[in-house]
Amino acid sequence: MNRGSLCPNPICLPPLEQSISKFLTQSGTFKDGDLRVNKDGIQTVSLSEPGAPPPIEPLDNQLSLADLEVIKVIGKGSSGNVQLVKHKLTQQFFALKVIQLNTEESTCRAISQELRINLSSQCPYLVSCYQSFYHNGLVSIILEFMDGGSLADLLKKVGKVPENMLSAICKRVLRGLCYIHHERRIIHRDLKPSNLLINHRGEVKITDFGVSKILTSTSSLANSFVGTYPYMSPERISGSLYSNKSDIWSLGLVLLECATGKFPYTPPEHKKGWSSVYELVDAIVENPPPCAPSNLFSPEFCSFISQCVQKDPRDRKSAKELLEHKFVKMFEDSDTNLSAYFTDAGSLIPPLAN
């Protein structure tokens, strides 16, 4: 890989984005393949059956946007925001993700991918999705509210996470990865601290499947370039085919960041920061992988990180294999209370705070 270049081959410009109109019906339904979303909810339809698909009918006891009271905005992104909302009757809190559709086909594809995965996934280690709607150019997704925020929020409060707590966090994330990798054949492709959410019950859940990839089989490979550059595996950055082992690399970086309190890749000593994202990703591809300092951490943790961040993905362990690692099991008999830790760390979001 050439210094300062993101890919070893000449960059190919993507085709011009197509109009958003290809995703909309005259009745105001957002569609992509078998997926249909409108003001009444979401459904998947059979494309093999002749004729128009049946209308979307609201389910009994279905959540609706009219039932929700907006409390405050708890997250912002380039295409929308996440609001804390409360059900007017039950007083239960939810997170409402509101996305403004634009004219880019890639945005529409990402939204439909997230909706499709949310609709079909049932796992206690993934953030639950309760309902989705499309109306007046907005996609609204009602999600489980994780009142502790994200691991990124936790790190801002505590600086570093001790090994016993990190082991418990790791076990929960690995169980989520086992589900998406082996049961659903999904590569997350954007695993990072801000996409791992926590709550006062000590739960840790994976969220944000907007750039995920659904494979045809567990042995299939992907080749598209999406996600957050710093947490990308070397094979993804270099444009090679990749598998769900790319998520394992990202997990290793996340855990090492939580343990040390800083991102594993640091700029050269004479620099205060990376001059560009290209310099950083070049270092990820060209330099030796990061490691946990053996004088600061247990042999079990150092071994676990090493098995996650092997440069060759064939040398990385799978999520199932890592669940059997000594680091994941070494604190099982100890009094590791994630619920108390998350609460004592002061990371909980006060729902009604100004």
UniProtKB/Swiss-Prot annotation:
Consequence of substituting T218E: Constitutively active. Increases kinase activity in vitro
One Gene Ontology MF term: protein serine kinase activity
Catalytic machinery residues: D190
Residues with PTM Phosphoserine: S224
Record-listed Phosphothreonine modification sites: T218, T228
Summary of the tissues where the protein is detected: Expressed in roots, stem, flowers and siliques.
Post-translational modification: Phosphorylation at Thr-218 and Ser-224 by MAP kinase kinase kinases positively regulates kinase activity.
Family named by the database record: Belongs to the protein kinase superfamily. STE Ser/Thr protein kinase family. MAP kinase kinase subfamily.
Protein name: Mitogen-activated protein kinase kinase 1
Species of the source: Arabidopsis thaliana (Mouse-ear cress)
High-level lineage: Eukaryota, Viridiplantae, Streptophyta, Embryophyta, Tracheophyta
